[in-house]
Curated annotation (Swiss-Prot):
Mg(2+) 2 binds at residues 239, 241. Is required for the biosynthesis of pyrrolysine. Catalyzes the ATP-dependent ligation between (3R)-3-methyl-D-ornithine and L-lysine, leading to (3R)-3-methyl-D-ornithyl-N6-L-lysine. ATP binds at residues 10, 31, 49-50, 72-73. Binds 2 magnesium ions per subunit. Pfam families: ATP-grasp_3, PylC-like_N. D-ornithine binds at residues 169-171, 225, 243-248, 302. Mg(2+) 1 binds at residues 227, 239. Its cofactor is Mg(2+). This is 3-methyl-D-ornithine--L-lysine ligase. The keyword ATP-binding applies. It comes from Methanosarcina barkeri (strain Fusaro / DSM 804).
Length: 363
Protein backbone atom coordinates (compact mmCIF):
# COMPACT_ATOMS: atom_id res chain seq x y z
CA UNK A 1 0.00 0.00 0.00
CA UNK A 2 1.30 3.45 -0.94
CA UNK A 3 1.18 6.31 1.55
CA UNK A 4 0.72 9.96 0.61
CA UNK A 5 1.43 12.88 2.93
CA UNK A 6 -0.83 15.89 2.39
CA UNK A 7 0.29 19.30 3.64
CA UNK A 8 -2.99 21.15 4.15
CA UNK A 9 -6.27 20.03 5.68
CA UNK A 10 -8.90 22.11 3.90
CA UNK A 11 -10.83 21.47 0.68
CA UNK A 12 -7.90 20.78 -1.63
CA UNK A 13 -6.73 18.33 1.00
CA UNK A 14 -10.13 16.66 1.10
CA UNK A 15 -10.15 16.16 -2.67
CA UNK A 16 -6.65 14.69 -2.65
CA UNK A 17 -7.44 12.48 0.36
CA UNK A 18 -10.66 11.23 -1.26
CA UNK A 19 -8.94 10.21 -4.50
CA UNK A 20 -5.96 8.76 -2.64
CA UNK A 21 -8.34 6.48 -0.75
CA UNK A 22 -10.03 5.51 -4.04
CA UNK A 23 -6.55 4.50 -5.24
CA UNK A 24 -6.05 2.34 -2.15
CA UNK A 25 -3.51 4.67 -0.55
CA UNK A 26 -3.01 5.55 3.09
CA UNK A 27 -3.47 9.27 3.83
CA UNK A 28 -1.23 11.13 6.27
CA UNK A 29 -2.25 14.73 6.95
CA UNK A 30 -0.07 17.58 8.22
CA UNK A 31 -1.65 20.89 9.23
CA UNK A 32 -0.73 23.51 11.82
CA UNK A 33 -4.40 23.94 12.76
CA UNK A 34 -5.44 21.42 15.46
CA UNK A 35 -9.02 21.73 14.15
CA UNK A 36 -8.10 21.16 10.49
CA UNK A 37 -11.28 20.48 8.52
CA UNK A 38 -10.34 16.96 7.35
CA UNK A 39 -8.38 15.85 10.44
CA UNK A 40 -10.81 12.98 11.05
CA UNK A 41 -11.00 11.93 7.39
CA UNK A 42 -7.25 11.25 7.11
CA UNK A 43 -5.77 7.97 8.36
CA UNK A 44 -3.14 9.83 10.42
CA UNK A 45 -3.06 13.49 11.47
CA UNK A 46 0.04 15.39 12.61
CA UNK A 47 -0.45 18.91 13.91
CA UNK A 48 2.60 21.13 13.46
CA UNK A 49 3.79 24.13 11.46
CA UNK A 50 6.08 22.88 8.68
CA UNK A 51 7.90 26.24 8.56
CA UNK A 52 8.74 26.16 12.28
CA UNK A 53 9.40 22.40 12.49
CA UNK A 54 10.55 21.24 9.04
CA UNK A 55 12.50 18.33 10.52
CA UNK A 56 9.19 16.65 11.42
CA UNK A 57 8.04 16.77 7.80
CA UNK A 58 11.42 15.61 6.51
CA UNK A 59 11.27 12.68 8.93
CA UNK A 60 7.75 11.83 7.74
CA UNK A 61 9.02 11.86 4.15
CA UNK A 62 11.18 8.82 4.98
CA UNK A 63 8.11 6.64 5.49
CA UNK A 64 5.72 7.92 2.83
CA UNK A 65 5.78 7.53 -0.95
CA UNK A 66 5.10 11.18 -1.80
CA UNK A 67 4.39 14.59 -0.29
CA UNK A 68 1.66 16.73 -1.86
CA UNK A 69 1.19 20.38 -0.83
CA UNK A 70 -2.57 21.09 -0.86
CA UNK A 71 -2.81 24.61 0.47
CA UNK A 72 -2.57 28.14 -0.88
CA UNK A 73 -0.45 29.58 1.91
CA UNK A 74 2.31 31.26 -0.09
CA UNK A 75 4.78 31.28 2.80
CA UNK A 76 4.29 27.53 3.21
CA UNK A 77 4.65 26.81 -0.52
CA UNK A 78 7.79 28.95 -0.82
CA UNK A 79 9.31 27.28 2.24
CA UNK A 80 8.61 23.79 0.86
CA UNK A 81 10.27 24.88 -2.38
CA UNK A 82 13.36 25.98 -0.43
CA UNK A 83 13.76 22.54 1.22
CA UNK A 84 12.45 20.29 -1.58
CA UNK A 85 15.89 18.72 -2.20
CA UNK A 86 15.97 17.45 1.40
CA UNK A 87 12.88 15.23 1.10
CA UNK A 88 13.30 11.45 0.99
CA UNK A 89 10.40 11.08 -1.47
CA UNK A 90 8.99 13.02 -4.44
CA UNK A 91 7.16 16.31 -3.80
CA UNK A 92 4.25 16.21 -6.29
CA UNK A 93 4.27 19.90 -7.12
CA UNK A 94 5.58 22.23 -9.82
CA UNK A 95 6.77 25.25 -7.84
CA UNK A 96 7.75 27.32 -10.88
CA UNK A 97 4.40 26.74 -12.61
CA UNK A 98 2.65 27.68 -9.37
CA UNK A 99 4.66 30.93 -9.17
CA UNK A 100 3.29 31.90 -12.58
CA UNK A 101 -0.25 30.64 -12.07
CA UNK A 102 -0.94 32.29 -8.70
CA UNK A 103 -0.09 35.72 -10.16
CA UNK A 104 -2.95 36.52 -12.52
CA UNK A 105 -0.98 39.24 -14.31
CA UNK A 106 1.98 36.92 -14.94
CA UNK A 107 -0.51 34.28 -16.11
CA UNK A 108 -2.13 36.65 -18.59
CA UNK A 109 1.26 37.72 -19.94
CA UNK A 110 2.03 34.02 -20.40
CA UNK A 111 -1.28 33.42 -22.22
CA UNK A 112 -0.57 36.28 -24.61
CA UNK A 113 3.01 35.14 -25.24
CA UNK A 114 1.80 31.85 -26.73
CA UNK A 115 -1.34 33.20 -28.41
CA UNK A 116 -3.97 31.87 -25.99
CA UNK A 117 -7.29 33.78 -26.19
CA UNK A 118 -8.07 35.59 -22.93
CA UNK A 119 -10.41 38.43 -21.85
CA UNK A 120 -9.28 41.90 -22.91
CA UNK A 121 -7.48 44.01 -20.27
CA UNK A 122 -8.83 47.43 -19.30
CA UNK A 123 -11.59 47.62 -21.93
CA UNK A 124 -12.86 51.07 -22.91
CA UNK A 125 -16.37 50.62 -21.53
CA UNK A 126 -18.27 48.51 -18.95
CA UNK A 127 -19.24 45.94 -17.91
CA UNK A 128 -15.89 45.07 -16.34
CA UNK A 129 -14.88 41.94 -14.48
CA UNK A 130 -12.52 42.76 -11.60
CA UNK A 131 -10.48 40.38 -9.46
CA UNK A 132 -7.52 40.55 -7.06
CA UNK A 133 -4.11 39.69 -8.55
CA UNK A 134 -3.35 36.61 -6.47
CA UNK A 135 -6.50 35.08 -4.92
CA UNK A 136 -8.43 31.94 -5.85
CA UNK A 137 -10.72 32.44 -8.82
CA UNK A 138 -13.87 33.35 -6.89
CA UNK A 139 -12.44 35.37 -3.98
CA UNK A 140 -13.04 39.09 -4.42
CA UNK A 141 -14.29 38.76 -8.01
CA UNK A 142 -17.22 40.88 -9.19
CA UNK A 143 -18.79 42.67 -12.14
CA UNK A 144 -18.71 46.47 -12.36
CA UNK A 145 -21.31 48.18 -14.54
CA UNK A 146 -20.29 51.82 -14.00
CA UNK A 147 -16.95 53.56 -14.59
CA UNK A 148 -17.18 55.46 -11.30
CA UNK A 149 -17.02 52.17 -9.37
CA UNK A 150 -13.48 51.64 -10.68
CA UNK A 151 -12.21 54.56 -8.59
CA UNK A 152 -11.90 52.76 -5.24
CA UNK A 153 -10.05 49.71 -6.54
CA UNK A 154 -6.55 48.76 -5.42
CA UNK A 155 -3.93 49.71 -8.04
CA UNK A 156 -2.97 46.08 -8.74
CA UNK A 157 -6.57 44.88 -9.25
CA UNK A 158 -7.13 43.19 -12.60
CA UNK A 159 -9.80 44.86 -14.71
CA UNK A 160 -10.97 42.81 -17.69
CA UNK A 161 -13.82 42.76 -20.12
CA UNK A 162 -16.79 40.83 -18.74
CA UNK A 163 -17.24 37.71 -20.86
CA UNK A 164 -20.59 35.97 -20.64
CA UNK A 165 -20.79 32.22 -20.97
CA UNK A 166 -20.25 28.90 -19.25
CA UNK A 167 -17.24 28.37 -16.98
CA UNK A 168 -15.39 25.21 -17.98
CA UNK A 169 -12.39 23.45 -16.51
CA UNK A 170 -9.77 21.00 -17.73
CA UNK A 171 -6.92 19.34 -15.81
CA UNK A 172 -3.52 18.57 -17.28
CA UNK A 173 -0.86 16.38 -15.66
CA UNK A 174 2.68 16.65 -17.02
CA UNK A 175 5.98 14.91 -16.39
CA UNK A 176 7.99 17.72 -17.99
CA UNK A 177 7.97 16.09 -21.44
CA UNK A 178 4.52 14.54 -21.90
CA UNK A 179 1.22 16.16 -20.96
CA UNK A 180 -1.99 14.24 -20.28
CA UNK A 181 -5.06 16.41 -20.91
CA UNK A 182 -7.84 14.72 -18.97
CA UNK A 183 -11.60 15.49 -18.89
CA UNK A 184 -13.63 18.66 -19.45
CA UNK A 185 -16.06 19.72 -16.71
CA UNK A 186 -18.71 22.41 -16.37
CA UNK A 187 -18.31 24.62 -13.28
CA UNK A 188 -21.71 25.83 -12.05
CA UNK A 189 -21.21 29.13 -10.19
CA UNK A 190 -23.35 31.20 -7.85
CA UNK A 191 -23.75 34.98 -7.63
CA UNK A 192 -20.43 35.27 -5.75
CA UNK A 193 -18.64 33.34 -8.55
CA UNK A 194 -18.11 30.41 -6.22
CA UNK A 195 -18.66 26.87 -7.51
CA UNK A 196 -21.62 24.92 -6.08
CA UNK A 197 -21.86 22.13 -8.67
CA UNK A 198 -19.67 20.35 -11.23
CA UNK A 199 -20.79 18.11 -14.12
CA UNK A 200 -18.86 16.52 -17.02
CA UNK A 201 -18.74 17.86 -20.57
CA UNK A 202 -18.06 16.25 -23.95
CA UNK A 203 -14.55 16.56 -25.39
CA UNK A 204 -13.69 19.94 -26.90
CA UNK A 205 -10.69 19.66 -29.27
CA UNK A 206 -9.85 23.39 -29.18
CA UNK A 207 -9.88 23.59 -25.37
CA UNK A 208 -7.81 20.40 -25.17
CA UNK A 209 -5.18 21.75 -27.56
CA UNK A 210 -4.95 25.08 -25.74
CA UNK A 211 -4.60 23.30 -22.37
CA UNK A 212 -1.88 21.06 -23.81
CA UNK A 213 -0.02 24.11 -25.17
CA UNK A 214 -0.26 25.89 -21.81
CA UNK A 215 1.26 22.87 -20.03
CA UNK A 216 3.91 22.12 -22.67
CA UNK A 217 5.28 25.65 -22.84
CA UNK A 218 5.94 25.84 -19.08
CA UNK A 219 6.89 22.84 -19.26
CA UNK A 220 4.66 21.39 -16.52
CA UNK A 221 5.85 18.72 -14.11
CA UNK A 222 2.84 18.33 -11.85
CA UNK A 223 -0.85 19.12 -12.18
CA UNK A 224 -2.56 22.20 -13.57
CA UNK A 225 -6.18 23.26 -13.85
CA UNK A 226 -7.19 25.43 -16.83
CA UNK A 227 -10.37 27.51 -16.52
CA UNK A 228 -12.08 29.15 -19.47
CA UNK A 229 -15.35 30.72 -20.50
CA UNK A 230 -17.31 29.50 -23.51
CA UNK A 231 -19.55 32.26 -24.79
CA UNK A 232 -20.77 34.02 -27.94
CA UNK A 233 -17.21 35.25 -28.60
CA UNK A 234 -15.79 31.73 -28.41
CA UNK A 235 -13.36 30.42 -25.83
CA UNK A 236 -11.48 32.71 -23.43
CA UNK A 237 -9.01 31.29 -20.90
CA UNK A 238 -9.46 33.11 -17.59
CA UNK A 239 -6.84 31.43 -15.42
CA UNK A 240 -4.56 28.51 -14.69
CA UNK A 241 -3.86 27.01 -11.27
CA UNK A 242 -0.81 24.78 -10.91
CA UNK A 243 -1.93 23.00 -7.75
CA UNK A 244 -4.24 20.10 -6.96
CA UNK A 245 -7.81 21.31 -7.58
CA UNK A 246 -10.90 20.65 -5.53
CA UNK A 247 -14.31 19.44 -6.76
CA UNK A 248 -13.50 18.80 -10.44
CA UNK A 249 -11.18 15.78 -9.89
CA UNK A 250 -14.03 13.72 -8.39
CA UNK A 251 -16.19 14.37 -11.46
CA UNK A 252 -13.22 13.50 -13.69
CA UNK A 253 -12.82 10.24 -11.76
CA UNK A 254 -16.41 9.05 -12.06
CA UNK A 255 -17.03 10.25 -15.63
CA UNK A 256 -13.72 9.15 -17.18
CA UNK A 257 -12.29 6.51 -14.86
CA UNK A 258 -9.07 8.54 -14.47
CA UNK A 259 -7.76 9.12 -10.94
CA UNK A 260 -5.73 12.34 -10.94
CA UNK A 261 -3.79 11.32 -7.82
CA UNK A 262 -2.60 8.13 -9.54
CA UNK A 263 -1.75 10.11 -12.68
CA UNK A 264 0.16 12.69 -10.63
CA UNK A 265 2.17 9.92 -8.95
CA UNK A 266 3.12 8.61 -12.40
CA UNK A 267 4.31 12.07 -13.46
CA UNK A 268 7.04 11.83 -10.81
CA UNK A 269 7.86 8.12 -11.23
CA UNK A 270 7.16 6.25 -14.48
CA UNK A 271 6.04 9.25 -16.55
CA UNK A 272 2.66 9.97 -18.14
CA UNK A 273 1.27 9.12 -21.55
CA UNK A 274 -0.67 11.68 -23.53
CA UNK A 275 -4.37 10.82 -23.62
CA UNK A 276 -5.81 10.22 -27.08
CA UNK A 277 -9.22 8.96 -25.96
CA UNK A 278 -10.96 9.08 -22.58
CA UNK A 279 -11.33 5.48 -21.31
CA UNK A 280 -14.91 5.89 -20.06
CA UNK A 281 -17.79 8.22 -20.85
CA UNK A 282 -20.11 8.21 -17.88
CA UNK A 283 -21.96 10.94 -15.99
CA UNK A 284 -21.49 12.47 -12.55
CA UNK A 285 -23.08 15.25 -10.49
CA UNK A 286 -21.07 16.84 -7.68
CA UNK A 287 -22.80 19.51 -5.60
CA UNK A 288 -22.87 21.27 -2.23
CA UNK A 289 -26.19 21.86 -0.45
CA UNK A 290 -26.56 23.71 2.84
CA UNK A 291 -29.30 22.69 5.27
CA UNK A 292 -30.78 26.12 5.91
CA UNK A 293 -33.56 27.46 8.07
CA UNK A 294 -36.82 25.50 7.91
CA UNK A 295 -35.01 22.58 6.26
CA UNK A 296 -34.55 24.29 2.89
CA UNK A 297 -31.56 23.00 0.90
CA UNK A 298 -29.52 25.91 -0.48
CA UNK A 299 -26.75 25.52 -3.11
CA UNK A 300 -23.50 26.92 -1.68
CA UNK A 301 -19.89 27.15 -2.76
CA UNK A 302 -16.55 26.29 -1.24
CA UNK A 303 -16.26 29.55 0.66
CA UNK A 304 -19.11 28.35 2.91
CA UNK A 305 -17.63 24.85 3.30
CA UNK A 306 -14.24 26.26 4.27
CA UNK A 307 -15.81 27.73 7.42
CA UNK A 308 -16.88 24.27 8.65
CA UNK A 309 -15.46 22.45 11.67
CA UNK A 310 -15.35 18.83 10.47
CA UNK A 311 -15.81 17.04 7.13
CA UNK A 312 -16.43 13.35 6.59
CA UNK A 313 -18.56 10.63 5.05
CA UNK A 314 -22.25 10.62 5.96
CA UNK A 315 -23.92 8.12 3.60
CA UNK A 316 -22.94 5.70 0.85
CA UNK A 317 -24.55 3.25 -1.56
CA UNK A 318 -23.72 2.32 -5.18
CA UNK A 319 -23.75 5.49 -7.27
CA UNK A 320 -24.22 7.78 -4.24
CA UNK A 321 -21.83 9.30 -1.71
CA UNK A 322 -22.82 12.04 0.72
CA UNK A 323 -20.32 13.92 2.90
CA UNK A 324 -21.27 16.13 5.82
CA UNK A 325 -19.45 19.36 6.62
CA UNK A 326 -20.39 20.37 10.16
CA UNK A 327 -20.76 24.04 11.00
CA UNK A 328 -23.33 26.66 11.96
CA UNK A 329 -25.48 25.18 9.21
CA UNK A 330 -24.68 21.65 7.95
CA UNK A 331 -23.45 21.45 4.35
CA UNK A 332 -23.74 18.23 2.37
CA UNK A 333 -21.39 17.39 -0.49
CA UNK A 334 -23.42 15.12 -2.76
CA UNK A 335 -21.71 12.90 -5.34
CA UNK A 336 -23.82 10.89 -7.80
CA UNK A 337 -22.67 8.82 -10.78
CA UNK A 338 -24.08 6.45 -13.37
CA UNK A 339 -23.81 5.30 -16.97
CA UNK A 340 -25.62 8.38 -18.27
CA UNK A 341 -27.36 11.59 -17.22
CA UNK A 342 -30.70 9.83 -16.68
CA UNK A 343 -29.34 7.16 -14.34
CA UNK A 344 -27.32 9.76 -12.44
CA UNK A 345 -30.39 11.99 -12.09
CA UNK A 346 -32.27 9.07 -10.53
CA UNK A 347 -29.39 8.59 -8.06
CA UNK A 348 -29.61 12.28 -7.18
CA UNK A 349 -33.34 11.94 -6.42
CA UNK A 350 -32.54 9.00 -4.14
CA UNK A 351 -29.78 10.96 -2.39
CA UNK A 352 -32.04 13.93 -1.77
CA UNK A 353 -34.67 11.60 -0.34
CA UNK A 354 -32.05 10.41 2.18
CA UNK A 355 -31.70 14.00 3.41
CA UNK A 356 -35.47 14.30 3.61
CA UNK A 357 -35.81 11.09 5.64
CA UNK A 358 -32.92 11.76 8.03
CA UNK A 359 -33.05 15.54 8.41
CA UNK A 360 -36.52 16.52 7.27
CA UNK A 361 -35.07 18.45 4.34
CA UNK A 362 -37.58 20.28 2.18
CA UNK A 363 -37.23 19.14 -1.44
Amino acid sequence: MKTICLVGGKLQGFEAAYLSKKAGMKVVLVDKNPQALIRNYADEFYCFDVIKEPEKLLELSKRVDAVLPVNENLACIEFLNSIKEKFSCPVLFDFEAYRISRDKKKSKDYFKSIGVPTPQDRPSKPPYFVKPPCESSSVGARIIYDDKDLEGLEPDTLVEEYVEGEVVSLEVVGDGSHFAVVKETLVHIDETYDCHMVTPLPANPLFRQISHDLAANLPLKGIMDVEAIFGPKGLRVIEIDARFPSQTPTVVYYSSGINLIELLFRAFTDGVEEIRAIPENKYCIYEHLMFGENGVLIPVGEQVLSMGSDYGKFYEEPGIEIFLCKGEYPVFTMVFWGKDREETGAKRCKGLSVLKERFGAVL
